[in-house]
A protein has these predicted regions:
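Glycine-aromatic micro-motifs
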Residues: 1-133
Length: 133
């Protein structure tokens, strides 16, 4: 299983949250990364959707030490069917593999994408999550 995970919100190392602290213990921070997408405010957390050229979301890339175990907890936290990347229509997020950019080039990583209606949500520009805003 691919051990790479792109995070862009609550799981960022700079965010004081129990899950970001847990992730720091279960993974190695590879570094900063970007994703071609759009970021929206979904209540107290962000939602990421696929974007087009020019749409950039800034985040971090992690290498999970035990991806299978970590994804059980992460999928539950993100509202994805436990232990699987499959989702039902009621779930807000889906875990999918996408290409992300790092300072050394592109790589494929797991990303949690928002599945809800973004037309009623506030877009987070310039694609950097700040929980204080």
């Amino acid at each position: 299983m691919n051990p790479l995970l792109f995070v862009y919100g609550t799981l960022l190392s700079s965010v004081d949250h129990p899950m970001s602290r847990r992730l720091a213990g279960e993974a190695e921070l590879v570094g900063e990364a970007t994703f071609t997408g759009r970021l929206y405010r979904v209540a107290w957390s962000p939602g990421l959707v696929d974007g087009e050229n020019g749409d950039v979301v800034h985040g971090e890339l992690y290498r999970l030490k035990d991806p299978e175990q970590a994804f059980v907890r992460l999928d539950e936290f993100e509202g994805v069917t436990r232990g699987s990347s499959s989702v039902t229509a009621q779930l807000e997020y889906a875990r999918v593999e996408r290409t992300v950019q790092t300072d050394t080039g592109s790589t494929v990583a797991w990303v949690y994408l928002f599945r809800g209606d973004v037309t009623v949500l506030q877009r987070v520009a310039p694609g950097r999550w700040d929980p204080a805003i």
